[in-house]
């Protein structure tokens, strides 16, 4: 079974992008709460 590189990249982006977005929001919220 051949691995589709584009499909793998698309899946990785689909998972990583929202995760990074939520992580950034979490860090910003934490930094605001600590002040």
From Swiss-Prot:
The keyword tRNA processing does not apply. SUPFAM superfamilies: Photosystem II reaction center protein M, PsbM (SSF161033). It is a single-pass membrane protein. InterPro entries: PSII_PsbM, PSII_PsbM_sf. Keywords: Chloroplast, Membrane, Photosynthesis, Photosystem II, Plastid, Reaction center, Thylakoid, Transmembrane, Transmembrane helix. GO terms for biological process: photosynthesis, light reaction. One of the components of the core complex of photosystem II (PSII). PSII is a light-driven water:plastoquinone oxidoreductase that uses light energy to abstract electrons from H(2)O, generating O(2) and a proton gradient subsequently used for ATP formation. It consists of a core antenna complex that captures photons, and an electron transfer chain that converts photonic excitation into a charge separation. This subunit is found at the monomer-monomer interface. PSII is composed of 1 copy each of membrane proteins PsbA, PsbB, PsbC, PsbD, PsbE, PsbF, PsbH, PsbI, PsbJ, PsbK, PsbL, PsbM, PsbT, PsbX, PsbY, PsbZ, Psb30/Ycf12, at least 3 peripheral proteins of the oxygen-evolving complex and a large number of cofactors. It forms dimeric complexes. This is Photosystem II reaction center protein M. The gene is psbM.
